[in-house]
Regions:
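Walker A/P-loop nucleotide-binding motif
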Residues: 25-41
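Dynamic helix-loop-helix/coil hinge segments at AAA+ ATPase domain boundaries and subdomain interfaces
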Residues: 1-12
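Short regulatory helix/loop adjacent to the ATP-binding pocket of P-loop NTPases
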Residues: 109-124
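Conserved AAA+ ATPase "SRH/arginine-finger" region at the nucleotide-binding site
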Residues: 111-112, 126-138
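Pre-Walker A adenine-sensing motif
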Residues: 10-22
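Conserved P-loop NTPase "ATPase switch" module shared by AAA+ and STAND
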Residues: 66-86, 90, 97-106
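Conserved AAA+ ATPase "sensor/coupling" helix adjacent to the nucleotide-binding pocket
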Residues: 141-152
Length: 170
């Protein structure tokens, strides 16, 4: 938690996850590009509120049995390789047992074209939580942290110079 830098680009996601269980919906889709901090946020959430986490392509019937004792279920890296029938069953279990689901993905689940029509309508029930591209403040913090992790010190003016010219991605 202490080495997660909250900025304008990730503040909504950080606050939403920390406001559990006072969410509008039990289904949250945490959206962000690779390295945007989704997994870091999920790990902070799990440390605080407990739960079970699995990669989307690893969901199986055994996992569906395991979740019974958990209130919070995390599906990481949702993609088109997911077993739609298992996902549908999972959503039904979460709905019926009043559990919570956080699904991380690069793109909103609502933009996905499911073969199962019921999943297309269910995907509209997710609260979408987007991590935006990093602003100057976050880029500054990320650069300093990466350099510090490697025990490299650099003049802050040089970091400012880099920030003005760097690509806005993670």
């Amino acid at each position: 938690d202490q080495d997660f830098y909250v900025s304008k680009s990730n503040e909504f996601a950080f606050k939403l996850l920390n406001s559990w269980p006072k969410w509008e919906k039990n289904f949250v889709n945490l959206i962000g590009e690779k390295f945007s901090g989704k997994t870091h946020l999920i790990n902070i959430f799990l440390e605080k509120f407990k739960g079970i986490k699995i990669e989307a392509n690893e969901i199986n019937n055994e996992f569906l049995k395991k979740i019974k004792v958990f209130e919070n279920i995390i599906i990481e890296n949702f993609n088109d390789k997911i077993d739609e029938n298992l996902l549908f069953t999972l959503l039904n279990i979460i709905d019926q047992d009043n559990k919570y689901l956080i699904l991380t993905s690069k793109n909103p689940i609502v933009d996905h074209s499911f073969k199962l029509n019921d999943l297309n309508s269910r995907s509209k029930n997710f609260l979408l939580c987007n991590i935006e591209k990093p602003g100057d403040d976050l880029m500054f913090a990320l650069i300093l942290k990466n350099l510090s992790d490697r025990q490299i010190s650099i003049d802050k003016k040089l970091v400012d110079f880099i920030i003005k010219r760097i690509d806005r991605s993670y």
